[in-house]
Amino acid sequence: MSDDMIYKEAIAAEVLQVTGRTGVTGEIFQVRCKILGGKDTGRILTRNIKGPIKVGDIIMLRETEREAKALGRRR
């Protein structure tokens, strides 16, 4: 599969809020993002993102069907 094929099907989303960190060492960020294109335009999703991220960043999502579960409270 070529790289061109992967990016043609991706949908842009803007990061609205960084809600928390997860993962064993906190390397995964949970963010709320707004879909900017496709059939779900305007929908707000919660997603898990690996790597540096901040509010206002544009991320490319391969699919917009799945949503991340809310982070549990620490005891």
UniProtKB/Swiss-Prot annotation:
Sorted UniProt keywords: Ribonucleoprotein, Ribosomal protein
One GO-annotated biological process of the protein: translation
Source organism superkingdom: Archaea
InterPro entries: NA-bd_OB-fold, Ribosomal_eS28, Ribosomal_eS28_CS
A GO term from the CC aspect: cytosolic small ribosomal subunit
Recorded family membership: Belongs to the eukaryotic ribosomal protein eS28 family.
Upper lineage: Archaea, Methanobacteriati, Methanobacteriota, Methanomada group, Methanococci
One example GO MF annotation: structural constituent of ribosome
Name by which UniProt lists this protein: Small ribosomal subunit protein eS28
Entries under Pfam families matching the protein: Ribosomal_S28e (PF01200)
Organism the protein comes from: Methanococcus aeolicus (strain ATCC BAA-1280 / DSM 17508 / OCM 812 / Nankai-3)
